[in-house]
């Protein structure tokens, strides 16, 4: 291996930044991910894959509630990516950043893409848990550019 660690090499791969959100009662749990990948893009059984830390409260909420949203952040939402990348208490549903659908999907206002998902499977034999989810609905705002994460920095394509 080169002088760079594998972690350094992989951090140089540019990725979109997403915020996973789960509703439980009057609370919204959220965390930032950069590991979102499509697994099946068919219209009848669209599936995505992502990873979360084993001790993730959001992961536990996904398994319990089954329904959640993945919000691909827009270029101007770096503040949300930073906020949700740290440990914090859940938000209350009434907070202005959320649009709640059917009491189970929390959409970030002005996200570039929103995927409403149902938990399908989990693979827990790795250092991080790998989640498979079925996409039940989706939307994209093509007028917004995505927020990108590369080499441990956020990149705003608008600047």
Question: What do the PLM-derived regions correspond to, one by one?
Answer:
Residues 1-159:
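Basic, polyanion-binding surface patches
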């Amino acid at each position: 291996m080169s002088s760079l660690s594998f972690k350094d090499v992989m951090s140089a791969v540019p990725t979109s930044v997403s915020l996973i959100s789960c509703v439980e009662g009057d609370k919204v749990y959220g965390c930032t991910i950069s590991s979102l990948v499509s697994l099946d893009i068919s219209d009848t059984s669209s599936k995505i894959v992502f990873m979360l830390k084993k001790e993730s409260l959001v992961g536990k909420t996904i398994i319990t509630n089954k329904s959640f949203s993945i919000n691909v952040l827009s270029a101007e939402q770096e503040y949300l990516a930073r906020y949700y990348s740290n440990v914090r208490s859940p938000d209350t549903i009434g907070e202005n950043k959320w649009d709640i659908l059917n009491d189970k999907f929390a959409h970030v206002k002005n996200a570039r893409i929103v995927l409403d998902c149902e938990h399908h499977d989990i693979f827990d034999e790795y250092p991080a848990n790998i989640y498979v989810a079925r996409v039940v609905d989706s939307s994209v705002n093509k007028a917004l550019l995505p927020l990108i994460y590369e080499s441990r920095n956020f990149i705003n394509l608008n600047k």
